[in-house]
From Swiss-Prot:
Record-stated family: Belongs to the ATG5 family.
Encoding gene per record: ATG5
Signal peptide stretch: none
Name this protein carries in UniProt: Autophagy protein 5
Reported function: Involved in cytoplasm to vacuole transport (Cvt) and autophagic vesicle formation. Autophagy is essential for maintenance of amino acid levels and protein synthesis under nitrogen starvation. Required for selective autophagic degradation of the nucleus (nucleophagy). Also required for mitophagy, which eliminates defective or superfluous mitochondria in order to fulfill cellular energy requirements and prevent excess ROS production.
Membrane topology qualifier: Peripheral membrane protein
Major place of residence: membrane
Post-translational modification: Conjugated to ATG12; which is essential for autophagy.
UniProt organism field: Kluyveromyces lactis (strain ATCC 8585 / CBS 2359 / DSM 70799 / NBRC 1267 / NRRL Y-1140 / WM37)
GO BP terms: autophagy of mitochondrion; cellular response to nitrogen starvation; piecemeal microautophagy of the nucleus; protein transport
Length: 271
């Protein structure tokens, strides 16, 4: 179990960032308008913006204030929100996955091709990044407040964390130090007293659902959760968690324990 958690924590994606045609300097060589980077599934795209803009920023025709404000990503012409973990976005937008038996396809080799865009007007669905890293941190804390409320019936646990504990929690994401992350995360959970499971479901038709799933009932499987939302899992309609196709008879509490993301939610992508 610990090995699986560690694999989830260190899971990564190969990403190609290409400057949007609308902002790139004409006749820029491909090598200077394209950047290949490895991002962690359990991270946020916004955290990579400074490095990306530093690499590509000299080849744009726009004037920009900083590496966060008025920048966004697109995939196949669709704006990509920064506020969800990278792995969740990849699972929803791309087709690659790993079976629950461990047999892998080309996920590790597949390149996630994103366009880097800039403009005064954000496209619909994009949360403006006006306060840089602080905004990412505040958003992440707000997500954990929601998750704690669902788990415990109150956000008191995260709100009562000491400043050093909360800073250690945040820095564990930046420094990728899993033991520090787990140490603080355990303070936010109440084993055997969980009220509901923080779960978010992205359906094949792009609907985003957040069902109320009680944790104190008899064993509830992924199939039960999907059935409660009138979602049928079939060969051509699979549930993907952390890049893995999950069997429908898996216990939902165990899935949360193993695969909950860095913002406290278990994300299920239906494809």
């Amino acid at each position: 179990m610990e090995e699986l958690r560690e694999r989830v924590w260190h899971g990564s994606l190969n990403v190609e960032i290409m400057l949007s045609d609308s902002i790139v300097v004409p006749n820029t060589p491909l090598s200077e308008k394209c950047y290949h980077i490895v991002v962690l599934r359990e991270s946020f795209l916004a955290l990579y913006l400074p490095a990306i803009v530093r690499k590509l920023g000299n080849n744009v025709i726009v004037t920009y204030e900083n590496p966060y404000k008025q920048w966004w990503f697109e995939y196949d012409g669709v704006p990509v929100p920064w506020e969800y973990p990278c792995g969740v976005l990849f699972d929803f937008l791309c087709n690659s996955s790993t079976t629950s038996t461990g047999k892998e396809d080309d996920q590790r080799l597949q390149m996630w091709k994103l366009k880097l865009c800039h403009g005064n007007k954000y496209p619909p669905g994009i949360l403006p990044l006006v306060d840089g890293l602080r905004q990412v941190k505040d958003h992440w804390k707000h997500q954990w407040k929601q998750a704690c409320f669902i788990l415990n019936g109150s956000a008191k646990r995260i709100m009562s964390l000491s400043i050093p504990d909360f800073e250690a929690f945040w820095q564990s994401l930046i420094s990728r130090h899993q033991p520090d992350y787990i140490k603080v995360r355990e303070k936010l959970l109440t084993p055997n007293k969980t009220k509901h499971i923080p779960i978010r479901v992205w359906t094949a038709d792009a609907s985003f659902l957040q069902p109320s799933i009680p944790a104190n009932s008899d064993t509830m499987t992924l199939f039960d959760v999907m059935t409660s939302m009138d979602i049928k899992l079939q060969e051509n309609n699979r549930a993907i968690i952390q890049g893995i196709v999950i069997c429908s008879d898996e216990d939902i509490i165990n899935l949360y324990d193993l695969f909950a993301s860095i913002d406290g939610f278990l994300y299920v992508v239906i494809k």
